[in-house]
């Protein structure tokens, strides 16, 4: 596409994406924090299925790295009255946790005696 046509095409795409994001927000399917989009389909699934669905959508399972991201995830938990799987697993050191890729966990906001692995963390 040439100059002006290219700019018009980009503006049309931006407008369309903005409209789609608006619809998803209205349906409580996405929320945003810090430039990241957090999304859900609102369905219950097991951990492995959740990880796979996130990959299929071109993303990854949510891993809160600060209070704002934690709140974005909590938004879905409260709205759908459910729990959320996180991109965190138990480390080889009992009682310690790490990211799925093995990196050190730099943010946690657990309730007392959690996580317990019962979906109530």
Where in this protein do the model-derived segments appear?
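Conserved hydrophobic ligand-interaction patch in extracellular adhesion modules
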Residues: 47-88
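Conserved beta-strand elements of beta-rich interaction domains across eukaryotes
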Residues: 38, 44, 67-68, 91-93, ...
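Surface-exposed ligand-recognition segments of extracellular binding domains, strongest
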Residues: 79, 83-121
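Intrinsically disordered, low-complexity regulatory regions enriched in Ser/Pro/Gly/Thr
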Residues: 25, 29-33, 53-55, 77-80, ...
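Extracellular disulfide-stabilized recognition modules
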Residues: 4-58
């Amino acid at each position: 596409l040439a100059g002006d046509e290219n700019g018009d095409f980009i503006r049309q795409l931006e407008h369309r994406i903005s409209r789609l994001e608006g619809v998803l927000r209205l349906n409580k399917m996405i929320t945003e924090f810090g430039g990241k989009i957090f999304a859900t389909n609102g369905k219950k699934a097991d951990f492995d299925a959740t990880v796979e669905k996130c990959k299929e959508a071109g993303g990854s399972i949510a891993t809160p790295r600060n209070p704002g991201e934690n709140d974005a995830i909590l938004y879905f938990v409260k709205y759908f009255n459910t729990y959320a799987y996180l991109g965190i697993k138990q480390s080889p050191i009992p009682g310690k946790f790490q990211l799925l890729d093995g990196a050190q966990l730099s943010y946690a906001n657990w309730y007392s005696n959690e996580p317990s692995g019962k979906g109530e963390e």
